[in-house]
């Protein structure tokens, strides 16, 4: 029976080829079909897998917000061909639309094989020193003012009442705005950790209380950087 392999990709730019352990690479060298977010980025990742098939003969299928007829992406599985599922960055299905494909695979009794790799969300949580036994990934922070204030109230309650760590990401060009908003609207004793450009040479983990962030806010420029925002006590 065909299998769906969930293949991790590099967190770095330019792409790093030291992501998947060698013994796992051997499991996927035979693949000829891949589902990716973006064809160009997916092709760069696939080249590093050192497949048995040359890249020109690899079938690359895109899954993104413009994709129609998602069921059709699984057709190779039904004819006995294994498929690899890749995110543009990090782990498939984590802050990534790949979960739709995995859900369909389960519905069709296709074996799903997750491979080991790095997640910026978990790396950031590990490095934050905040509660790793009760945490929530919230995706992107709301943009509209009303929804933002509702979210602030919600996460503040969860942080204080349940000691639940809250994790967010943001579009890189809105990072600075989100940082300022959090500092100006959260309670002084809440801890905010920024995990910046993880696994890159300029990686930073910065942790302060909101009170302290207010004193040093102008010191850090995170515009257009890859940042994980982590909140807790």
Segments predicted by a language model, with ranges:
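Short Gly/Thr/Asp-enriched flexible loops that form oxyanion-binding sites at enzyme active sites
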Residues: 93-108, 182
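Short active-site oxyanion
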Residues: 28-34, 110-113, 165-166
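Glycine-rich, flexible N-terminal cofactor/catalytic loop recognition
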Residues: 1-63
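Class I SAM-dependent methyltransferase SAM-binding "motif I" and its flanking Rossmann-like core
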Residues: 2-5, 101-158
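A contiguous loop/helix-start segment that scaffolds small-molecule binding in enzyme catalytic cores
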Residues: 2-6, 81-82, 161-233
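Short glycine-rich anion-binding loops that position phosphate/pyrophosphate groups of nucleotides
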Residues: 11-13, 88-92, 172-173
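Ordered, amphipathic secondary-structure segments that act as subunit-interaction surfaces
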Residues: 79-97
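Conserved helicase motor
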Residues: 61-68, 141-145
């Amino acid at each position: 029976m065909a299998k769906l392999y969930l293949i991790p990709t590099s967190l770095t730019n330019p792409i790093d080829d030291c992501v998947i352990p060698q013994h796992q690479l051997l499991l996927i060298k035979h693949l000829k079909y891949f589902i990716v977010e973006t064809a160009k980025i997916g092709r760069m990742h696939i080249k590093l897998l050192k497949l048995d098939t040359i890249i020109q003969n690899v079938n690359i299928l895109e899954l993104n917000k413009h994709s129609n007829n998602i069921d059709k992406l699984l057709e190779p599985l039904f004819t006995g061909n294994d498929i690899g599922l890749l995110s543009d960055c990090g782990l498939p299905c984590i802050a990534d639309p790949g979960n739709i494909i995995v859900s369909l695979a389960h519905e069709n009794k296709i074996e799903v094989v997750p491979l080991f790799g790095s997640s910026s969300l978990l790396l950031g949580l590990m490095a934050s020193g905040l509660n790793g036994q009760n945490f929530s990934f919230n995706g992107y922070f709301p943009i509209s003012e009303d929804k933002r204030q509702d979210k602030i109230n919600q996460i503040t309650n969860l942080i204080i009442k349940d000691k639940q760590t809250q994790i967010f990401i943001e579009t890189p060009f809105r990072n600075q705005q989100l940082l300022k908003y959090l500092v100006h609207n959260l309670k002084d004793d809440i801890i905010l950790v920024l995990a910046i450009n993880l696994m890159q040479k300029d990686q930073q983990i910065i942790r302060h209380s909101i009170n302290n962030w207010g004193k040093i806010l102008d010191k850090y420029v995170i515009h257009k950087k890859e940042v994980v925002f982590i909140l807790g006590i």
